[in-house]
């Protein structure tokens, strides 16, 4: 990994990286996050009794939609033709709360880490929004990339996925 910031030019100004000369390769990234909540809140969500409706289904769709809009939210991200976005939401009674995993994939010239991170983040934010009326003490955290593949820098994965849980 290079120690150089690619979005900063020689004068220190932010710029969008020119990826036009890069080869198109299959690229994928997976990000995760978690929403910690009261056990009663988790039960309410899992039973489908939240006042705003289907929390898990709505949050999953919000994450997918967010990945597709990443370049509208993050100033120097390229608009990408994603070929796959998937969001998984799993209950974790030990947290207690919901764990989120988001995958983004494409064949292109730049990575999809930001799209995976955006999907995971917005999924967590949507869970919070839909359950905040019953639990204002929810906590969003552990949002990070846990694996990526493709591109010039090759494949990478967190060596201990549980290290930040």
Curated annotation (Swiss-Prot):
Gene3D superfamilies: Molybdopterin cofactor biosynthesis C (MoaC) domain
Name of the protein in its database record: Cyclic pyranopterin monophosphate synthase
Keyword Thylakoid on entry: no
EC numbers on record: 4.6.1.17
HAMAP family assigned to the protein according to its UniProt record, in alphabetical order: MoaC_B
Protein family membership: Belongs to the MoaC family.
Native species: Brucella melitensis biotype 2 (strain ATCC 23457)
Molecular functions per Gene Ontology: cyclic pyranopterin monophosphate synthase activity
Binding residue positions for substrate: 76-78, 114-115
Physiological role: Catalyzes the conversion of (8S)-3',8-cyclo-7,8-dihydroguanosine 5'-triphosphate to cyclic pyranopterin monophosphate (cPMP).
Subunit structure of this chain's protein: Homohexamer; trimer of dimers.
Regions crossing the membrane: none
GO biological process: Mo-molybdopterin cofactor biosynthetic process
């Amino acid at each position: 990994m290079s120690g150089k910031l690619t979005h900063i030019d020689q004068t220190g100004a932010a710029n969008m990286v020119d990826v036009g000369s890069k080869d198109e390769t299959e690229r994928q990234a997976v990000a995760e996050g978690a929403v910690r909540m009261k056990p009663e809140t988790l039960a309410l969500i899992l039973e489908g009794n939240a006042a705003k409706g289907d929390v898990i289904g709505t949050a999953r769709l919000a994450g997918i939609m967010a990945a597709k809009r990443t370049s509208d939210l993050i100033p120097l991200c390229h608009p990408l033709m994603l070929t796959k976005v998937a969001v998984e939401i799993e209950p974790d009674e030990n947290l207690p709360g919901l764990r989120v995993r988001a995958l983004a994939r494409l064949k292109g010239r730049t990575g999809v880490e930001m799209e995976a991170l955006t999907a995971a983040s917005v999924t967590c934010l949507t869970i919070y929004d839909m359950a905040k009326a019953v639990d204002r003490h929810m906590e969003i955290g552990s949002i990070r990339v846990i694996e990526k593949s493709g591109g010039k820098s090759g494949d990478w994965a967190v060596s201990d996925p549980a290290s930040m849980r």
